[in-house]
Amino acid sequence: MAHREKASHLGPFKPTLILHGGAGALSRANLPSELWTRYHASLSRYLAVTRELLNSGSTALDAACHAVALLEDDVLYNCGRGSVFTERGTIEMEASVMVCSVDPGGPPAGSIKRGAAVSLIRNTRHPILLAKEVLVTADEDGGMGGTSTMHCHLSGRDVEEWGWAEKALEKKPDHWFWTQRRWEEHRRGLHQQSSYNFADLIASVDPLSEQLHQEDDGLDGVREIPSQGTVGAVCMDSWGNLAVATSTGGLTNKKAGRIGDTPTAGSGFWAESWDEDTYNNRAPFRSTQGAQPPLVTLVGRMPVLYQLVTQTSNLLGSCLSPTESDEEHQQYRAEAPAPAYTAYKSPPLLPRYDTSTQQPIRHRRHALAMSGTGNGDSFIRVNACRTVASICRLDYPSPPLAEAMRVIAGPKGELQRSAGDRWGKTGEGQGGMIGIEVIDEQEPDVECGVDSKGETKSKKKTGRVAFDFNCGGLFRAYYEVDEKTGTEEPKVMVFKEEY
């Protein structure tokens, strides 16, 4: 009975997620089997735990942040406790979150700001939870609490102290984040391996620290672990809400004060949703010969123009629509659905028609969320994640997220091209992306099936995970769906092929 009551609170979508643990010049030579076994086990565990949260009714935002918080406590990854050192021997962490939804009313939390980030974080155990608090702080007063509550990117000591004092986030001393392998990596990069070892570092803070006697981490014989360990999670909950959460320690021996792509909206993370029309695969931007079509025809063919005209007309009246009467315009106008999270239904199907062909125009909601990992400066230069979203949103017909990712993050994609003749020499341009795409399309006369009692039953709607990378490997964990049977299988991979 309790299970039935819990299930009644779930929505019409089948939850899913995808995680990443970094991307870069990975190979079997620098990723021995014993180290890969550790990565495989940890990613498998975090994937299963987060999926269980989603299946039990957790929101996408809560689930994504929970997954990343687990990764932040794992020294395998370049975030939280496994963060790399700056050239000054300090640690400066970054994190970001962003949300969107196929529900026109938006997700239950974070929809006012949509995205938030923190940077130059030194002593907060979970930077991702600090970013989450920055995101949702505007929800408390509906965005009317003043300028200071609407900032989307905060950095440094002040935001940390706010998190500790007002949000009860956990504070840790500097040395809690230090790990021997990251320190040795830092010293090798400065060509100062033996001048000041990890024991010297710890003893300088606390001569009696237990960190002087490292516990067995099961990695005997492994000299170093990959530094390209930025982590991310993209989740979709049962209500069609998407959330992306990303966290990193940055680049090894980076300049102190450097801001990377992880807290830069559009570069290392992005989430977006929009309304779009489908025209039975007829391209709306096809050029026409002869006389120019009337405005109403252009509106019907161009979704972006249609949205601009209808939204402006809704605000200022039919005087802005000289080509049609108010009655004629009604067929293009949809009432704004009430933003009720628990009562979400698919957008209503309105009888609208293409004026040039008289064929019905179908309406749908499109949402996607992405997290990137790799050389952050390259992601910033090409605004990687938002560019992928733009391809999906502005091209017609809208390509799948996986195809748009390939253009930017795939082999010979925009990230790789941005490195020019430095590709393969400096690490520039290397990286990968993960994401989820969901399209909520309501079509007429779709049979959902009938159960044993003769009642109509609906099939759970699904999202699609996507990923791509242009380098040696991308640590990733997701659920692979068999298109024929609909069955799922958890997958944990690093290379294009199985390890």
PLM region spans:
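Alpha/propeptide regions of enzymes that mature by internal proteolysis
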Residues: M1-Y499
